[in-house]
Swiss-Prot record:
Its main location: cytoplasm. The gene is kars-1. InterPro entries: Aa-tRNA-synt_II, aa-tRNA-synth_II, aa-tRNA-synth_II/BPL/LPL, Lys-tRNA-ligase_II, Lys-tRNA-ligase_II_bac/euk, Lys-tRNA-ligase_II_N, Lys-tRNA-synth_II_C, NA-bd_OB-fold. Ca(2+) binds at E467, E474. It comes from Caenorhabditis elegans. GO terms for biological process: determination of adult lifespan; lysyl-tRNA aminoacylation; negative regulation of gene expression; positive regulation of nematode larval development; positive regulation of protein phosphorylation; regulation of brood size. This is Lysine--tRNA ligase. Substrate binds at G256, E280, E318, Y320, N477, E481. It catalyses: tRNA(Lys) + L-lysine + ATP = L-lysyl-tRNA(Lys) + AMP + diphosphate. It is found in: Cytoplasm. One of its GO terms (cellular component) is mitochondrion. It comes from the Eukaryota.
């Protein structure tokens, strides 16, 4: 049996406790040399920043002018960033509380918040690259020509600032940088909206995307996904042996799609030109020339309406594949999109809110291949419960009258000119397209709706064409290309008649393209997909403006909308 432990006297207990306390104070004092705030010095009473946007703007301009007058450049040419904010977080996340590293690093970012604890300690949150870190500026470690208080008086929310110092983790567990050198890189002249409320006005967000990105950093996520879509597309097609090409944006004839073009004028040639509505005809001429697989990612321009799914300029990917038909292109499309969605989202099934975030209903969109197929003509007849004219007679006036009556009887609106093609398109949109949630191929379009598609090999009057829909919207269009130059010219002539009848979207005869076809286009499958609409689906946005960095906006009486935090860009 061991001897009983000697009991310490009360005095001895007090002595040991006092010694332990002193040791703890010594450790905390040592830690404070790099990490712990010094005791607050008497606060310096400073004038509050103006709340009026114009006065605030003037104050910031005066600060810049005063620095320039003193020979100080308020906009330095260079700051050497040694580590990104993302890498800073990755590298120093393992730090324990109150641990400080010896390594000196330099970071930079935009100030989103500023908090002062007396006159000797200032906290900042700096944002950049979609992330943020805390800066803990302590007067004890400050070096530089400008004194601590003056320097930090200059720095406001919105400024871009560089910091050089050591990484640490505070007592509260916040990963931070303790700077010894601070350089104001770019002053922000305007007051930023309060970070708690952010920027909610959608129209203002779209008009001032730069401010939207500053205050709503998650908006960038939409454009990261958009970029991934385009990168995946290019890599996929490159791996299949396609050649990426560039074709003219200004054309003498607006061909390749049924759409109303933008018109511009070339002064030297003294002629009108059209911004391209589609690159299709150029691509097929390249296939005639022997480039069997071509694709292009680029902007198209259509002088039509602006709404939740349409913008006058938009981005598409088009490809043309010799010795393939629309069945080959269907299989390629299924593989391309299903593998893309899996690569970007990590699953085939995604959720989509057609009425906007956090609303009902919620669609489950399933990109698992194979996709559903619906035959346009048979599907429409079934939905209408009607017998439709034989597809081979759709060019007749009798057929047009049947579809005109169907639209009237079913209250389906169709503005003039009420051609058979336009009437059919409205009926299909109302009764078929509106039901397609998961990816669905709509196949077998009539020839009168598809002037560039090849006739169906077994059903007269129809073509070998498909449109791909998801969440009720068209995202791709493809067909076996018409390569018969005689039939192509006849279809162009019919389109010209429709244009004379008032259809602004009908195509004109393109003699250069017709001549190219006469040299021989091999059997070819062609395909086009809208990048913007696919981006909307994969980012769960119901407004196309959310996936366009700078969407088209209607003017506001010739003046730009002002906000309660805006100020003129000139001194009052």
């Amino acid at each position: 049996m061991s001897e009983p432990e000697a009991k310490l006297s009360k005095n001895e207990q007090k002595r040991l406790a006092k010694q332990a306390k002193k040791e703890q104070e010594r450790l905390e004092k040592d830690a404070a040399k790099l990490n712990v705030a010094v005791a607050d010095a008497p606060k310096v009473v400073r004038e509050a920043d103006p709340s009026d946007p114009q006065e605030y703007f003037n104050m910031r301009v005066r600060m810049i002018e005063a620095r320039r007058a003193a020979g100080d450049n308020p906009f330095p040419h260079k700051f050497n960033v040694t580590i990104s904010l993302t890498d800073f977080i990755t590298k120093y996340t393992p730090l324990e509380k109150e641990q400080v590293v010896e390594e000196i690093v330099s970071v930079a970012g935009r100030i989103h918040s500023k908090r002062e604890s007396g006159s000797k300690l200032v906290f900042y949150d700096i944002h950049g690259e979609g992330t943020h870190i805390q800066i803990m500026a302590n007067a004890k470690f400050h070096t530089g020509d400008v004194d601590f208080v003056t320097l930090h008086d200059r720095i406001k929310r919105g400024d871009i600032v560089g910091f050089t110092g050591r990484a640490t983790r505070t007592k509260a567990g916040e990963l931070s940088l303790i700077p010894n050198e601070i350089l104001q890189l770019t002053p922000c002249l305007h007051m930023l909206p309060h970070s708690h409320f952010g920027l909610k006005d959608k129209e203002l967000r779209f008009r001032k995307r730069y401010l939207d990105l500053i205050l709503n950093p998650r908006v960038k996520d939409n454009f990261v996904i958009r970029s991934k879509i385009i990168t995946f597309l290019r890599r996929y097609l490159d791996n299949l042996g396609f050649l990426e090409v560039e074709t003219p944006i200004m054309n003498q004839i607006a061909g390749g799609a049924t759409a109303k073009p933008f018109i511009t004028h070339h002064n030297d040639l003294d002629m009108n030109l059209f911004l391209r509505v589609a690159p299709e005809l150029y691509h097929k001429m390249l296939v005639v020339g022997g480039i069997d697989r071509v694709y292009e990612v680029g902007r198209l321009f259509r002088n039509e309406g602006i709404d939740l799914t349409h913008n006058p300029e938009f981005t598409t990917c088009e490809f043309y594949m010799a010795y393939a038909d629309y069945e080959d292109v269907i299989q390629l499309t299924e593989d391309l999109l299903s593998s893309m969605v899996m690569s970007i989202k990590g699953t085939y099934k995604i959720e989509y809110h057609p009425n906007g975030p956090n609303t009902e209903p919620v669609y489950e969109v399933d990109f698992t291949p194979p996709f559903k197929r619906v035959h346009m003509y048979d599907g429409l007849a079934e939905k209408l419960g009607a017998t439709l004219p034989d597809p081979s007679t759709l060019h007749t006036e009798e057929a047009r009258e049947v579809f005109d009556k169907l639209c009237r009887d079913n209250n389906v609106d169709c503005s003039a000119p009420r051609t058979t093609a336009r009437l059919l398109d409205k009926l299909v949109g109302e009764y078929l397209e509106s039901t397609f949630i998961s990816p669905t191929f709509l196949i077998g379009h009539p020839q009168i709706m598809s002037p560039l598609a090849k006739w169906h090999r077994s059903i007269p009057g129809l073509t070998e064409r498909f449109e791909l829909f998801a969440v009720t919207r068209e995202i791709a269009n493809a067909y076996t290309e018409l390569n018969d130059p005689i039939t192509q010219r006849q279809r162009f002539e019919q389109q010209a008649k429709d244009k004379d009848a008032g259809d602004d979207e009908a195509q004109m005869i393109d003699e250069t393209f017709c001549n190219a076809l006469e040299y021989g286009l091999p059997p070819t499958g062609g395909w086009g997909m809208g990048i913007d609409r696919l981006s909307m689906i994969l980012t769960d946005n119901n407004n196309i403006k959310e996936v366009l960095l700078f969407p088209a906006m209607r003017p506001e009486d010739g003046t730009e909308k002002k906000t309660d935090f805006d100020a003129p860009t000139t001194l009052a």
